[in-house]
Amino acid sequence: MKIDIVTIFPAYLDPLRQSLPGKAIESGLVDVQVHDLRRWTHDVHHSVDDVPYGGGPGMVMKAPVWGEALDEICFDETLLVIPTPAGALFTQATAQCWSTERHLVFACGRYEGIDQRVVDDAVRRMRVEEVSIGDYVLPGGESAAVVMIEAVLRLVAGVLGNPASHRDDSHSPDLGRLLEGPSYTRPPTWRGLDVPPVLLSGDHARIAAWRREASLRRTRKRRPDLSGARFVWGLGLS
């Protein structure tokens, strides 16, 4: 997999060189390149934004600069991702789908966003997804890009040491799109708090049933909106 990130703040993406993403890069499982958008400017001030047509606060990132950058970086098989609070919600299912892509390009906007014509032009040549990581607004797309890239990379074959590690994650298909239940490790008693006895029993069937029930309880309490939870409760299974 190849990932290109275009931004006016390249250092913002440095965390991708750490931990799991960093190991994936070092091992050659993924090639991550960060590009400074200002490289495609042609004026002495390296301007990337201008005032919005129609008036209003803030500045809008200029189409000609973004157009040249994407022309150079993207090709027919590229999936262009534009982080924006006005986008579709990024989910675990999205991450799973993107984990099999050959080439992802993240266009990190700032200010009031990127001129809409950049998107309108790009969709004529490649697949484009405008995506949000939640119902809130960030100063730019870089933080969202890091979140999405980390979520995707841990699902890429070979990145996790144990391929089964993500199967029981919160929101995963194998967990029925529910939240993962609580986890415990040694010691069995700490500050008067005990590990649930069933987890010490060695009875795998009982442990699996306990974890399923704990997952349902947590989901019902914290995220009753999740479709997996609604389906199970609709069947009267909790």
Curated annotation (Swiss-Prot):
- Upper lineage ranks? Bacteria, Bacillati, Actinomycetota, Actinomycetes, Mycobacteriales
For binding S-adenosyl-L-methionine, which residues are annotated in this chain's numbering?
G109, I133, G134, D135, Y136, V137, L138
Alphabetic keyword roster: Cytoplasm, Methyltransferase, S-adenosyl-L-methionine, Transferase, tRNA processing
Q: Which GO terms describe its molecular function?
A: tRNA (guanine(37)-N1)-methyltransferase activity
Query: Organism, per UniProt?
Result: Mycobacterium leprae (strain TN)
Q: Which family does it belong to?
A: Belongs to the RNA methyltransferase TrmD family.
Q: Cite the CDD domains for this sequence.
A: TrmD-like (cd18080)
Q: What is this protein called?
A: tRNA (guanine-N(1)-)-methyltransferase
Reactions catalysed, semicolon-separated, are: guanosine(37) in tRNA + S-adenosyl-L-methionine = N(1)-methylguanosine(37) in tRNA + S-adenosyl-L-homocysteine + H(+)
The UniProt entry, under Pfam families, shows: tRNA_m1G_MT
Picking any one GO biological process from the record gives: tRNA N1-guanine methylation
Question: What's this protein's function?
Answer: Specifically methylates guanosine-37 in various tRNAs.
List the SUPFAM superfamilies hit by this protein, alphabetically: alpha/beta knot
**Enzyme Commission designation:** 2.1.1.228
The entry's localization annotation reads: Cytoplasm
Q: Quick one: which gene encodes this?
A: trmD
Where is it predominantly found? cytoplasm
Question: Record's InterPro entries?
Answer: Alpha/beta_knot_MTases, tRNA_m1G_MeTrfase_C_sf, tRNA_m1G_MeTrfase_TrmD, tRNA_m1G_MTases_N, tRNA_MeTrfase_TRMD/TRM10
Q: How does it assemble?
A: Homodimer.
Q: Name one GO cellular component term.
A: cytosol
